[in-house]
A protein has these predicted regions:
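Transmembrane alpha-helical segments and their boundary/interface "anchor" motifs
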Residues: 50-53, 57, 68-106, 115-127, ...
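Membrane-interface alpha helices of multi-pass inner-membrane proteins
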Residues: 176-185, 292, 296
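Alpha-helical transmembrane segments in multi-pass integral membrane proteins
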Residues: 1-15, 25, 29-47, 65-77, ...
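Alpha-helical transmembrane segments
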Residues: 18-28, 92, 124, 128, ...
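Residue-level signature of the transmembrane alpha-helical core
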Residues: 21, 58, 91, 95, ...
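Hydrophobic core segments of transmembrane alpha-helices in multi-pass, intramembrane catalytic enzymes
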Residues: 51-58, 153-157, 189-197, 263-268, ...
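Membrane-interface helix-loop-helix regions
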Residues: 65, 86-155, 159, 171, ...
Length: 368
């Protein structure tokens, strides 16, 4: 086996953390007008939620390729690492989502039909904990957790990557083929976005870009993203897909923006590759706060939706009142910090559980 590539530079690693945190913030901002916390406005900076998910997908592929090559020598280690990362946040938040929905229904803040999943918890809870909410024609997030939809893509991309990386020969072909058939066309459409992160990681190991060109390229990608939003290309490309989609029985649903996603993906990949060679060493001055903020990204991504939906259901929120809006922001930040302390910041609890479960996994299967 070839020796692993050297670690990423601290400055580039910090840049990726900045992108990760800002992507989560833009998702939160996009939901303020979408959920009705503020009046709908034309400001493009409040409508970057989908583009931020593309950033997450590219980042995910990049980081998984990097950590797998350097740290996870076996499929057993890979599965433990991925399950720990995902379930440390997903499990508590899904349970809180169901509990919050039950509270709203019981106390009369929402009609039972709004949270119909409560009537079949035995079906929907396992479905969401197995990330099956986006398979084929299904498109259902857990109660109060609309952003969870992206995990229905990302987790299966983890599984596909693990099969590709650790299996060999006929077994790999059979397993990958079966997985692709199982997940369905929506996940096929966005797979290139996630896989581009893997490709970007391997490309940057062997290639460099001159710093002046990298700085120019970095600026151009940001300018093109702004132009993309101002021109409304995201909306136009989505309508193009919807108007010309040939499979009436297989609506793309959460993947209906895949053409726009591909364009944004190209900008994100180019931005990352340029940033890697642009030497943003100034970020080292703020390394500590950046790492700290980034450590709450996954929690913020899910918690904000739960908090926002609960707040708007039980509190007479006024869109035009800055005190109400600021209070909602404070509650989101506070709950992210509180819940993050028992999720992302306590991954070792979950890791211990998965290590014990993996101990029952036949050693031969774990090293295939």
């Amino acid at each position: 086996m070839a020796p692993p590539a050297p670690p990423l530079s601290r400055s580039f690693s910090l840049y990726l953390d900045v992108c990760r945190f800002l992507a989560a913030v833009f998702v939160v901002l996009s939901h303020f007008p979408q959920y009705g916390a503020v009046a709908e406005v034309a400001n493009p900076w409040l409508h970057l939620g989908r583009e931020s998910v593309v950033v997450f997908f590219v980042l995910s592929g990049f980081v998984i390729a990097y950590t797998t090559e350097r740290k996870n020598a076996s499929m057993r280690e890979y599965c433990i690492a991925r399950c720990t990362r995902i379930y440390s946040v997903a499990l508590p938040l899904v349970l809180l989502g169901f509990a919050g929905a039950a509270f709203l229904v019981v106390d009369g803040f929402a009609p039972p039909e709004q949270f119909y999943q409560l009537g079949k918890v035995w079906l929907y809870l396992p479905m969401h904990l197995l990330f099956m909410g986006e398979l084929w024609t299904v498109s259902e997030p857990p109660p109060l957790l609309a952003p969870y939809w992206s995990l229905g893509y990302e987790v299966w991309y983890y599984v596909l990557f693990g099969a590709m990386f650790y299996l060999r020969g006929r077994r790999r072909l059979l397993v990958v083929g079966a997985l692709l058939l199982f997940v369905g066309p929506k996940l096929w459409l966005l797979l290139p976005v996630w896989a581009s992160g893997v490709a970007a990681y391997h490309w940057q190991k062997k290639h460099t870009i001159a710093r002046p060109l990298a700085l120019a390229g970095w600026c151009v990608t940001l300018a093109l993203l702004v132009a993309f939003k101002l021109a409304g290309l995201d909306v136009s490309l989505r309508m193009l897909v919807l108007d010309n989609w040939p499979f009436a029985g297989l609506h793309p649903k959460s993947a209906d923006r895949f053409l726009a996603d591909y364009l944004v993906c190209a900008l994100v990949v180019t931005n990352f590759l340029c940033a890697k060679n642009a030497d943003f060493s100034a970020l080292l001055r703020i390394e500590r706060p950046v790492r700290w903020l980034a450590s709450y990204t996954f929690t913020l991504y899910l918690v904000h939706a739960l908090v926002m939906r609960m707040w708007l259901a039980v509190y007479p929120h006024r869109q035009s009142d800055p005190v109400d809006v600021l209070s909602l922001v404070v509650v989101i930040v506070s709950m992210t910090s509180l819940i993050g302390q028992v999720t992302e910041h306590r991954k070792e609890w979950f890791e211990a559980v998965f290590v014990r479960l993996a101990a029952r996994w036949p050693r031969r299967a774990a090293t295939q």
